[in-house]
């Protein structure tokens, strides 16, 4: 009997750049993919021009996001084209993420510049898939389908499913690799959504609502803290539903103090609360648990009851204002942000006025304003009463102007208020030292920043300060 003593072939050391578009949930997915790739021997680089392979984690939420994703893929393809002329090193461009999952073969056919389109089911084997593309092998993109059909109907049984869920990987060590060294990190509570808002396609490609086990969330929280995270930003499509498929709808109230107690974590922040599901116990937990930011990301979407009913949502100005009163009864200085959709099919001028009156009364810190656009496969796309694009743009401009004024007013109301600022950027320049961070009422990237005056703080410090000025949503504060 003879044995083959020849050495195993040495795999080529490949570099990869992850380009992430869209929301914080996508950031988590990118870091999971990065962890899988690094574990398989890929070298991670930041600059796509310096990478052998470019993986673009796309967003497929609204039309503008889709365009941005396609443009980014084309830019990466330009790098590959230049390398083929001896002016670079890029050898493969791959699309992943929501746009890739949502359109699959259709995206691959319409965008031949991308070497492959990977769906969520490809994520566990991303390294092998990517190596095969670099080796010149073809990859057949998936046929798009409704991912809600992949999980059991009974919520409690969903945790037993073997269907890959991006951002839910767990085990003895976190399957994740941080792509920046900032003090804030997103942490997934759940994926998918069981609600059926008429304008939203997300459940079709993200699937039914699936909570992560608390032990997995806590394990990843500890890992993030060990890797420099000081604020944990809890993300999902609907955080108020966390635990319902685990048999405990109040699980988030239990989990929050445990997360806040993780060594090294200074602050925990919850995102995306569905107003119709925001219960009194959860409000109290967010408002009063030490280490949890009194921050309420309430997605109202509109205030007119008729419009909300057409959206397959619930509420009206009175119930929303009562909810805000409940929040501020527990935490008067709580941060509250929201998003609204303007120009929804059938929206009348009276509906628009109702929305504007509500925004004035609500005193929100920040409001995102979006113009309605049809999304493939949604109920709203079939509705009558569509407004023309010019009218939608005019309404968006009107509401945006109002929101800009209201945001400035709300920030000015915080003058003299004491805040705790997590420092995220320190820069020395000709004009002096800039120390930028966020107070408890300011979420990452979308809610403005707080600038510390005459401060020697470092990135990651939590500084107590008093607000002395404001501009838009931004604040100036002096350390105490």
UniProtKB/Swiss-Prot annotation:
- Keyword terms: 4Fe-4S, Cytoplasm, Iron, Iron-sulfur, Metal-binding, S-adenosyl-L-methionine, Transferase
**Which InterPro entries does the protein's record reference?**
Elp3/MiaA/NifB-like_rSAM, Methylthiotransferase, Methylthiotransferase_CS, Methylthiotransferase_N, Methylthiotransferase_N_sf, NA-bd_OB-fold, Ribosomal_uS12_MeSTrfase_RimO, rSAM
Domain (Radical SAM core): residue spans on this chain: 179-410
* Cofactor section: [4Fe-4S] cluster
Q: What is this protein called?
A: Ribosomal protein uS12 methylthiotransferase RimO
Q: Where does [4Fe-4S] cluster 1 bind?
A: 23, 59, 98
User: Which reactions does this protein catalyse?
Assistant: L-aspartate(89)-[ribosomal protein uS12]-hydrogen + (sulfur carrier)-SH + AH2 + 2 S-adenosyl-L-methionine = 3-methylsulfanyl-L-aspartate(89)-[ribosomal protein uS12]-hydrogen + (sulfur carrier)-H + 5'-deoxyadenosine + L-methionine + A + S-adenosyl-L-homocysteine + 2 H(+)
In terms of SUPFAM superfamilies, this protein maps to: Radical SAM enzymes (SSF102114)
Q: Which CDD domains does the record match to this protein?
A: Radical_SAM
The free-text function statement in the UniProt record for this protein reads: Catalyzes the methylthiolation of an aspartic acid residue of ribosomal protein uS12.
Q: Which GO terms describe its cellular component?
A: cytosol
- Every TRAM domain range: 412-480
Q: Say which species the protein is native to.
A: Nocardioides sp. (strain ATCC BAA-499 / JS614)
